[in-house]
Amino acid sequence: MTDVTTPPGPTTALRAEPQGGWRRILGWAMWDWGSQPFNTVITTFVFAVYLTSESFGSTNTTSTALAVSTAVSGLLVALLAPVLGQNSDRSGKGVRNLRLQTWLLAALSAALFFVKPEPGYLVLGLVLLGAGSIVSEIASVNYNASIEQVASPRNVGRVSGFGWGMGYLGGILVLLLLYFLFIQPEVGLFGVSDEGAIDIRVSMLVCGLWILLFTLPTFAVLRDAPKEPGPRVGVVASYKLVWASLRRLWGQSRHTVYFLGASALFRDGLAGVFAFGAVLAAGTFELTAGEVIIFGAVANIVAGIATMLFGLLDDVLGPKRVILISLVSLVAIGMAIFVLHDGGKMVFWTLGLTMTAFVGPAQAASRSFLARVIPEGQGGEIFGLYATTGRVVSFLSPAAFGLFIWIVSLVTGQDNTQYWGILGIALVLAAGLAVLVPVKTPQAQVGSQAG
């Protein structure tokens, strides 16, 4: 059973035959595993929380500063991703660029060690964190495009799912190691304590080392194919070329452009599930701080395993069906959590963990969808547009979450309306689902050159 398809589209970069065995695929997926500490430890659970603590000023001041920094870095990613991706395509140096960006990400992560718990270090922390976010996103563009070197149309779903699942598992493993070895004990490994926040700062050094070491297998299996580099072009000309490529893609494979729009919507909803899950856990379902961390750990394990399993279905059912199944399930479970919000912790543990099982599969299937249809030689550029479209609408989930809470609180005069934010996230997911339904899977022609 496969997705309903449109007439044949442009030649895809994927080759007809698999590009090596599972050892090669594992090497590729180690980038997901190795780079994940930046997302899990630095931007979500540890450093961002540290940076918004009272050590750096009032909570309102630090939280606002972090929000502004995040917005600026997101805007820069939206502007730079397609152009830098196009540059990788034109130069044929996508793997080289990925290697340099990964090393820079490791250095920026380790440099967070120098952010001491004093107000004067807030700007340094924001600059390093923002720069790391930009580098991480741009590196992901080149990494996603490199899937053509290890996958074929027959296994791209399970390869993408395996990589995404490795990211979940690697991120949560390093988080747990750091928590139990350095952060939780009064005196941790090597005598590390919380004096001067040295436990947090040493954790940043470990993250940098983790990124550097565990991504090495990726660069052992990926190679830049010999290619005559295209002529150098200026910044303005680069954006003109991106626009010309988008128009050409619109003419050749219009439903791929539709998919970029649909995925931008539902990917923002998927991000909202994890972004506001911890907020709801503590505020509505009254989980303690320790319970939230435990829930986050279990949720990432569930998401990682589920993503790998759904990758197998991707190659059988097609990526669009996997995404549809995931989105329908997420909306339904979200509505159930809303209705049963008075049920306490058991409701959140049961339905919340079930919900996380469908987030990763939708993300991984989105990557495999594009990998199947991207025209040959345009992987970096199209995955750059994929990053850009996601950034353009990244305000929707936070806005919908907050708007539902604010309106209901205003109408009812009650303060305990946080759970209404669940409907905001469900609405964004449902909007992405509605836009995705009419999208057809372009039947791209398979490339014939060796990978």
Please tell me what each predicted stretch does.
Residues 102-119, 328-342:
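C-terminal ends and interior cores of transmembrane alpha-helices
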Residues 79-93, 306-319, 405:
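Helix-to-loop junctions at the C-terminal end of transmembrane segments
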Residues 88-103, 315-329:
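Cytoplasmic membrane-interface "Motif A"-like loop-to-helix N-cap segments
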Residues 59-61, 182-209, 403-429:
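A membrane-interface helix-boundary motif in multi-pass transporters
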Residues 42-63, 275-292:
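Short amphipathic helix-loop junctions that connect adjacent transmembrane helices
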Residues 320-364:
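C-terminal transmembrane helical hairpin of 12-TM major facilitator-type secondary transporters
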Residues 210-221, 423-451:
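Multi-pass alpha-helical transporter architecture, strongest
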Residues 9-26, 223-261:
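Juxtamembrane intracellular "pre-TM" segments in multi-pass secondary transporters
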